[in-house]
């Protein structure tokens, strides 16, 4: 990957996409490699804006932690807007400008193997973030246990349906088919449903995790299975929100239990309103901080501490928590992930009061 053509393309992308970075410490900065003091530039490449978390949580939390650990470090942030080609250009640009570490949450985890290879060819360590890249080992991986997440939300839903003595089957609304993390969640979702009395009525891999595409698909399934839908296992809060919207638009009342994942504000509001059954609390601060710590360790010439290995990549995997109306106050508000002022607005104020959230 050190060919002339690659260098020309990368430099061109750099000029077009980002401009020139200030010389703030390069990979051969001796002070940053002696284990005493880090300096340099970390590229932080996020996948999309379909989920609000990347702009509102991941970016500021990562940047804050890097600043705490390394005053002289700079973060180069880019969002791929759900376009793998755009993210490839952003990565090429960062590599051409000589970033010291690349943190990557891939739009397309298969296509992003090229990004990993290109960076490593320039001796730039790559930290895969949230979504694993299965076909090309990165230098480090930080995430929550995605397969475990899928199993947890599905088992939680099955337990709820059993308690309600529900009949019928389930709609399975998975994440993006080009996201390896989504495939792990999907595997867990299926495992969580297996052995229950609830048949999987239909399954859907949601392109780009797009909530509208999930909503459109669920609307189509309602015409086929309307009276047989006991619930829906949705892979994240975006697809869960799309599922809820489709069920409400079809006049299904009450809305059957629907799962989610990410604990977005809108999902917490739906849980409080009784429109979504569960979500997953996986505080972004945990993975953002872990990724920042790993990046700064690489800048110091150190190896980040791994607790396991996944897809031949040293990894840190954290355990999340299921959130329902029963524990939302404790998990979300008492732990100050969100405040009542952020969530208990307008129509949600009464539900918050009922749950003791103030």
Task: Tell me the role of every PLM-derived stretch.
Residues 18-21:
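Bacterial Sec-type N-terminal signal peptides, specifically the leucine/valine-rich hydrophobic h-region
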Residues 2-7, 13, 23-358:
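A residue-level marker of the well-folded mature domains of exported/periplasmic proteins
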């Amino acid at each position: 990957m050190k060919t002339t053509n690659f260098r020309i393309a990368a430099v061109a992308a750099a000029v077009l996409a980002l401009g020139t970075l200030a010389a703030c410490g390069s990979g051969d900065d001796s002070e940053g490699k002696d284990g005493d003091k880090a300096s340099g530039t970390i590229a932080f490449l996020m996948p999309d804006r379909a989920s609000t978390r990347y702009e509102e949580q991941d970016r500021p939390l990562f940047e804050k932690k890097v600043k705490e650990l390394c005053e002289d470090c700079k973060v180069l942030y880019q969002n791929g807007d759900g376009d793998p080609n755009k993210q490839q250009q952003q990565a090429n640009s960062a590599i051409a400008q000589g970033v010291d570490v690349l943190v990557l949450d891939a739009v397309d985890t298969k296509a992003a193997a090229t990004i990993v290879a290109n960076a490593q060819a320039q001796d730039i360590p790559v930290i895969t973030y949230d979504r694993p890249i299965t076909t090309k080992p990165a230098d480090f991986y930080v995430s929550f246990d995605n397969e475990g997440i899928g199993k947890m939300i599905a088992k939680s839903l099955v337990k709820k349906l059993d308690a309600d003595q529900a009949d019928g089957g389930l709609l399975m609304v998975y994440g993006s088919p080009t996201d390896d993390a989504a495939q792990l969640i999907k595997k867990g979702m299926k495992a969580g449903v297996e052995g229950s009395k609830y048949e999987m009525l239909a399954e859907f891999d949601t392109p780009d995790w797009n909530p509208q595409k999930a909503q459109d698909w669920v609307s189509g399934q309602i015409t086929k299975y309307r009276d047989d839908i006991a619930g829906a296992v949705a892979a994240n809060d975006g697809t869960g929100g799309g599922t809820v919207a489709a069920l409400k638009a079809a006049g299904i009342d009450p809305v059957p239990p629907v799962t989610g994942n990410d604990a977005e504000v809108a999902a917490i509001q739906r849980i409080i309103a009784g429109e979504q059954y569960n979500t997953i609390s996986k505080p972004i601060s945990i993975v953002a901080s872990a990724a920042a710590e790993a990046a700064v360790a690489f800048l110091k010439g150190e190896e980040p501490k791994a607790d396991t290995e996944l897809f031949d990549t040293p990894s840190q995997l954290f355990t999340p928590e299921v959130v329902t109306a029963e524990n939302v106050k404790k998990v979300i508000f008492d732990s100050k992930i969100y405040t009542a002022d952020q969530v208990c607005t307008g129509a949600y104020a009464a539900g918050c009061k009922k749950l003791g959230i103030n």
